[in-house]
Swiss-Prot record:
The lineage of its organism: Bacteria, Pseudomonadati, Chlamydiota, Chlamydiia, Chlamydiales. One of its GO terms (cellular component) is cytosol. Homotetramer. Reduced FMN (FMNH(2)). Belongs to the chorismate synthase family. One of its GO terms (biological process) is chorismate biosynthetic process. Its EC number is 4.2.3.5. Pfam families: Chorismate_synt (PF01264). Keywords: Amino-acid biosynthesis, Aromatic amino acid biosynthesis, FAD, Flavoprotein, FMN, Lyase, NADP. It comes from Chlamydia felis (strain Fe/C-56). FMN binds at residues 123-125, 283, 298-302, 326. This is Chorismate synthase. Its cofactor is FMNH2.
Amino acid sequence: MRNRFGCLFSLTTWGESHGPSIGLVIDGCPAGLPLSLEDFVPVMLRRSPGRLGTSQRKEADIVHILSGVYQGKTTGTPIALQIFNTDIDSETYRKQDDRYRPGHGQFAYEKKYGIVDPLGGGRSSARETACRVAAGVVAAKLLAHYDIYCLAFLSKLGKESIKEYPQFTHEFAQSVYSSPFLSPLASDTITKQLMDLQKEKDSLGGVVSFITSPIHESLGEPIFYKVQAVLASALMSIPAAKGFEIGLGFASADKYGSEYIDPFIFEEGKISMSSNNCGGSLGGITMGMPLNGRVAFKPTSSIKQPRLTVMKTGEPTVYSTPKEGRHDPCVAIRAVGVVEAMVNLVLADLLLQQRCSRL
């Protein structure tokens, strides 16, 4: 089983949903980067459960630095971080351990490995993404040193979506971070949809978009490691992710070449483009434009309606999520921080690779 992501700036995560703790090791972070416990607090809060539209499992998600930092700066050695699980309720899973949970990876996991930890989803639980968000904090600090910034936000919930694609500004980022749903969509509209979901005992899918500041570093390679290829791999590894696109994405298929091509222009002493249909990547390499893309998330499989399934012995039966079960009615809300983290991790890794690509 592979638990490592990245090449030069790499992340390894460990732990299960209902284990004592989860954690991660970052390898390849340069020495001298300022890093403190306070850096993690606001970012971890944006992913944390316990609010409307998210799981009612209340985890503090306090990050503990075990190694790799001395006197407030990274030392260049592996950075080990640990997050304790403090709000675990395994009994609801043990009660129905004799049957498979519809829509979850438990059956496939057990078929592949012959053994599975079913409590809270075990290793395949979205709980693991807290580690990615913590790692994203370190990656974001490295990128900020090179004036590269990324923002993710909820751009579509069910049939409600943003009308225009925004540009990255720090002011827009602050407005997203101050929203309870990390979205430019109207909070009262989202609240109504989520309240309706609770009444209907159902769940809803969504889309998380990301935008970056202009990236003047040449990140990515022209063949197998195009920036969009690495982003796709990273973002599609997030639990419940079902689709990825960059720039116009699938809408590109509806365009004529004369409509799609981004014209080059010379502006303020440098070559740029007058549009960004490509999403910030030409030939798989960034070239001064902002990156932008979207990730589609399926509706959460854990809904409080009875669903058809089978016993582990093969007999037909029903799986019912207990009333006390704690699950996200819309996983896309908490996925916002995970998308932002994974984009930051990809860009940090490609940035270090770019430093090695030429004299």
